[in-house]
Swiss-Prot record:
<keyword id="KW-0378">Hydrolase</keyword>
<feature type="active site" description="Charge relay system">
    <location>
        <position position="665"/>
    </location>
</feature>
<comment type="pathway">
    <text>Mycotoxin biosynthesis.</text>
</comment>
<dbReference type="InterPro" id="IPR029058">
    <property type="entry name" value="AB_hydrolase_fold"/>
</dbReference>
<dbReference type="GO" id="GO:0004252">
    <property type="term" value="F:serine-type endopeptidase activity"/>
</dbReference>
<dbReference type="Pfam" id="PF00326">
    <property type="entry name" value="Peptidase_S9"/>
</dbReference>
<keyword id="KW-0720">Serine protease</keyword>
<comment type="similarity">
    <text>Belongs to the peptidase S9A family.</text>
</comment>
<dbReference type="InterPro" id="IPR051167">
    <property type="entry name" value="Prolyl_oligopep/macrocyclase"/>
</dbReference>
<dbReference type="GO" id="GO:0070012">
    <property type="term" value="F:oligopeptidase activity"/>
</dbReference>
<keyword id="KW-0645">Protease</keyword>
<dbReference type="GO" id="GO:0006508">
    <property type="term" value="P:proteolysis"/>
</dbReference>
<dbReference type="Pfam" id="PF02897">
    <property type="entry name" value="Peptidase_S9_N"/>
</dbReference>
<dbReference type="InterPro" id="IPR023302">
    <property type="entry name" value="Pept_S9A_N"/>
</dbReference>
<feature type="active site" description="Charge relay system">
    <location>
        <position position="701"/>
    </location>
</feature>
<protein>
    <recommendedName>
        <fullName>Prolyl oligopeptidase ophP</fullName>
        <ecNumber>3.4.21.26</ecNumber>
    </recommendedName>
</protein>
<feature type="active site" description="Charge relay system">
    <location>
        <position position="580"/>
    </location>
</feature>
Amino acid sequence: MSFPGWGPYPPVERDETSAITYSSKLHGSVTVRDPYSQLEVPFEDSEETKAFVHSQRKFARTYLDENPDREAWLETLKKSWNYRRFSALKPESDGHYYFEYNDGLQSQLSLYRVRMGEEDTVLTESGPGGELFFNPNLLSLDGNAALTGFVMSPCGNYWAYGVSEHGSDWMSIYVRKTSSPHLPSQERGKDPGRMNDKIRHVRFFIVSWTSDSKGFFYSRYPPEDDEGKGNAPAMNCMVYYHRIGEDQESDVLVHEDPEHPFWISSVQLTPSGRYILFAASRDASHTQLVKIADLHENDIGTNMKWKNLHDPWEARFTIVGDEGSKIYFMTNLKAKNYKVATFDANHPDEGLTTLIAEDPNAFLVSASIHAQDKLLLVYLRNASHEIHIRDLTTGKPLGRIFEDLLGQFMVSGRRQDNDIFVLFSSFLSPGTVYRYTFGEEKGHSSLFRAISIPGLNLDDFMTESVFYPSKDGTSVHMFITRPKDVLLDGTSPVLQYGYGGFSLAMLPTFSLSTLLFCKIYRAIYAIPNIRGGSEYGESWHREGMLDKKQNVFDDFNAATEWLIANKYASKDRIAIRGGSNGGVLTTACANQAPGLYRCVITIEGIIDMLRFPKFTFGASWRSEYGDPEDPEDFDFIFKYSPYHNIPPPGDTIMPAMLFFTAAYDDRVSPLHTFKHVAALQHNFPKGPNPCLMRIDLNSGHFAGKSTQEMLEETADEYSFIGKSMGLTMQTQGSVDSSRWSCVTV
C-alpha cells in the first residue's frame, strides 16, 4: 500500500523502552508504555521537541494551504466579521456607564464610557458615542495583548486592570486613574497614562479593593523565570495586599500555605468593605475551605483573626451582599444546585440561614441585589437561563422577567440603582441589550440596543430542541440549528460540538462562523447537552465525571446515531469538534467509534489521562477525572484515556483529524497533542485520511488571540472539514457589512 498523496508523515523518534508502572486495584502492577515521553520536554528546552514542532507545522501548513477553499473561507470570514458589536452598559463608581465595543475587525474589544444620564447618546447610527477609555489594541504591535479583567476603586478614581500577552494565563496588574483615558491617536505598543504600580506573578485576576480605595487584595505566585512557558505546575498561591503608589516588593502578605502547594487561595470583600472572605480551593470541585474576618477589627496581614464560616471542604461560597453584620451568600451547602443564605458575622455560631431554598430542577447561576431590596436570580433550567426576582428580606417571589426569551443572559447593575442592563443572546441572536426598571409593584423592560448583521437574515435559520436516548437509556437534550430550507433527507453534513465536564453548560450561544458554515455547506449544527455539564443541575455533572466519564462519550456517540437515524445527517458527512476538556471527548469518541465520524477537530485538548496531573494546573483536575496514581481511579481512567487507547494498526480506518494546539499553552500543555498525534501517525502511516497538527507559536489556551488569528484558524478548520467530507462551498456566503449594524430604539 502506497502513501497517500499528502504523505509520508514527518519522522519522530519512538522509544519502545519508555514505560511507567502504575498500581491497579484489579490487576496489581501495570506497566504502561509511553513511547513519546520525550515530547513532554517543553518546546524551548528541547531540540527534539522543537524539531518535531517545526516539521509538523510545515507538514500541516502545506496540506492546509493547498486547499483552494481555504482562501475562499478566509475572505468570506473577513467580510462577514466586519460588523459592530458591543456589551451591556455597566455602571461604575466614577459616575459613568462602561461598555465594550468593536467596530468590526479590531483585534480586541475596546472599553468606552458615558456619563450616567447620557446613555441614550451611545451606540447610535453615528458610532459608539461616549468616550474611549481603554483600547487594548494599542498595548502591542501584533494585537496579542488582552485585557483579562478590571475593577474600579470605590471612590471612582482608580482602575485596576490585568493584561496578558499571547493568550498566557500569566498576567500583570496595572493601575491607572480614571481621569487618564486612552487617546485614539496613541502610539501602538505603549500604555501611556497608567501609574507606576505593576503587579507580577499573577495567574488569576481576583482583585478586591478596600473601602478606603487605598489598595486592593490579589492572588499571586512566587517569582518564576519561566512564567508563560513550560509545563511546570503552578504552586504555592499566596494572597497579598497592595497599596496604591508603592512597589510590589512592599506589598503585605495576607496568606500563604506551603504545606498545600497546589491549593489556590483568594479573597472577596463584601460591598460595604467591612468583611473579608478567604477561600482556598484544592481542586476543581465545588468545595472550599472558607474563613471570614472583620476589617474593622483587624490590621491587614498574616495575623488577622479569622472565623470559620463552616466546616471545610463541604461547600463553596460567593458573596452576594451585606447589610450591617448580615452577609448574603450564594452557596451549595446542603444544596447541590445552590441556594441563597445569610450569615450573621456577630453571631457566627448560629451558622447560615436559608433565604432562597435550592431549586431541585434548576441550577442557580448567579445572585445579585438591585433597587435596594430586590434579589435577582439567574437559573439554568433545561439548558437555558431564567431570571427570577425575589424580595431580599422575605424571599417572597416577585415574578420572572424575559420569560419569552430562550438563551442566556448577562446582568449588570448595582444595588443602589433602580435600573439594570441585561444582555441576551442565543444561537440566532448576536446580542440584544434590554433596560429593566424595578418598580414598587411591577417593573418594566425596554429594548436599549440590538446588534444586527447586515446581509445575514437570521430568519433563514431555525433552532429546535430534541431529546434522544443514550446507551443506558438516559434521555439527553440536544440543540439543532440549521437553515430552514435544509431538507431532513439524510444527505446533510453535520458539525457536532460537545464538552461534557466541569459542570460547564453548553448554552445557546451565537456564533457567526457556525451560521456561515451551515449556510455555505447547507449543513446542520448540533450541540448535545451531554452529561458532565450542569444543564440539568449538579447531578447531571456528577453523572459524567470520575468513574462515570464513559457516560459522556456514550451520550455524544448516541447523539450522532440519533441524527443519522432521524435523517438529519448523512452517515458519511459528520464532523465533531471539541476543545480543552472537550478534547478528551473528541479523541475518545474517535477511538471508540472511528467509523461513526468522517472528521474530528480537537482544540488544545487534554488527552494523556495518566500524566495530566503532572503539568500546569492538571493536579486540580483530579476531582473531575480521578487520580491515576490511585489504584481504583487508575482502572477507569486507563480504560478510556485517548492516548492509551488508539486502535492498533490493522483494518481500522480513522477519521480525518485536525488538532489545534499552542506551543506556549500554560493551561493545557501541548504535550498532550504532541504525543497523541505522534502515536496516531505511527499507527496509521498510510491511512486514507490525514492526521494533522496546527501549532501556534504565538498564543496560549484560547484567550488573547487577535481577530485575524481567529479567522485564520477558522478558515483552516472549515476548509479541512469541507475537503475531508467532500463538501462544496455553495456561495461566497459573506454578508454585506457596508451598512450600520446596530438597531436603536
